[in-house]
Amino acid sequence: SPEAPVHFLVIPKEHIKSANYITKENSHIIAHIFEVINKITSELGISEDGYRIINNCGKLGGQTVDHLHFHVLGGRELKWPPG
């Protein structure tokens, strides 16, 4: 369920299990993900005020899906710690 007024996921098509599996060979995918995030946050009008990018890595980091993905949250003030 959404954690903020704006909450979307960015998921690479190529399978990368987690951030632990980012390599020199696939790092271009990560660069593309951040280009996509920049484009979408700008289109949604949240880039100026700010947003949060979340990636959970490993069991203790809260990762429940074995495919790298990023949550992007914005549209309100985001507190810390998140939970």
Each predicted region: which residue ranges?
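HIT superfamily nucleotide-processing domains
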Residues: 1-83
